[in-house]
């Protein structure tokens, strides 16, 4: 009898573990969005707790983060070690925001576009902006990946809140993750070493955690509001918040 109960308990544990680690489907994702409301939460997988290092407080009307900085899991819950059919230890180098196809992508601060690439085999369309120095003196260079139409070109000066791109459709590549989203990747490195699709996983030197540089404080991103004054060296959300 003891042996029977031991086998039963082990079976239940294995079953629960298998369920917890399975990838959710796109349908599952939309169901969760509908149940919880599609604004203002950070979606977590596998009981992963604050991989960014901060408790994140999203505005109630902001699009959700579906894979956070340093997360081990992709936008649909799969392990990042499985990307491209390869096995390696990897953490997320940026923040993934779920946004609907065609939605506006905004400049997170004043800056200068220093890189543009379309139809990248890994991430689709992407571009990079130098937002200047942060309050702690680090250079804030941000790559925007998986986008649709890009409204800026290399060398353009941009203003905070300016329309810089449209959200792209589902990226049908090894790096798309199976869900449309904006990948917002921040680095202090210069030149080609500070941006590009090969920088979004792993652990290269120079990564910066965007959650340290929000205008609302660490872990407290704010929606851009036209006409409001913001301090230099800090970022507002690159995605549009809905009206409450």
Language-model segments: residues:
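Sec/Tat signal peptide C-region and signal peptidase I cleavage site
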Residues: 16-20
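Short peripheral tails and domain-boundary helices/loops at the edges of structured domains
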Residues: 145, 183-219
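Sec-dependent N-terminal signal peptides
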Residues: 4-13
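Surface-exposed, glycine-biased beta-strand/turn segments
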Residues: 21-125, 134, 160, 169, ...
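Solvent-exposed coil/turn segments that connect beta secondary-structure elements
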Residues: 102, 132-134, 187-191
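Zn2+-dependent peptidoglycan hydrolase active-site motif and core
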Residues: 92, 107-154, 170-183
């Amino acid at each position: 009898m003891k042996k029977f109960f031991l086998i039963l308990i082990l079976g239940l544990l294995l079953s629960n573990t298998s369920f917890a680690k399975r990838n959710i489907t796109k349908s599952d994702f939309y169901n969760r969005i509908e149940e919880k409301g599609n604004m203002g939460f950070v979606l977590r997988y596998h009981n992963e707790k604050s991989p960014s290092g901060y408790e994140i407080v999203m505005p109630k009307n902001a699009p959700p983060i579906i894979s956070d900085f340093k997360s081990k899991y992709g936008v649909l819950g799969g392990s990042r070690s499985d990307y491209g059919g390869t096995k390696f230890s990897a953490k997320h180098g940026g923040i993934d925001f779920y946004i609907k196809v065609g939605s506006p992508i905004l400049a997170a601060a004043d800056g200068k576009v220093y890189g543009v690439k379309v139809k990248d085999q890994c991430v689709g369309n992407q571009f990079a902006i130098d937002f200047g120095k942060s309050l702690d003196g680090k250079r804030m260079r941000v790559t925007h990946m998986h986008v649709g139409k890009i409204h800026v070109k290399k060398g353009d000066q941009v203003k905070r809140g300016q329309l810089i791109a449209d959200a792209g459709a589902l990226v049908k590549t090894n790096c798309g993750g199976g869900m449309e989203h904006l990948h917002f990747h921040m680095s202090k490195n210069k030149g080609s070493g500070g941006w590009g699709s090969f920088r979004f996983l792993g652990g290269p030197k120079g990564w910066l955690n965007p959650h340290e540089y929000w205008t609302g404080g660490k872990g407290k991103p704010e929606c851009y509001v036209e006409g409001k004054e913001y301090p230099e060296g800090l970022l507002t959300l690159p995605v549009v918040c809905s009206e409450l």
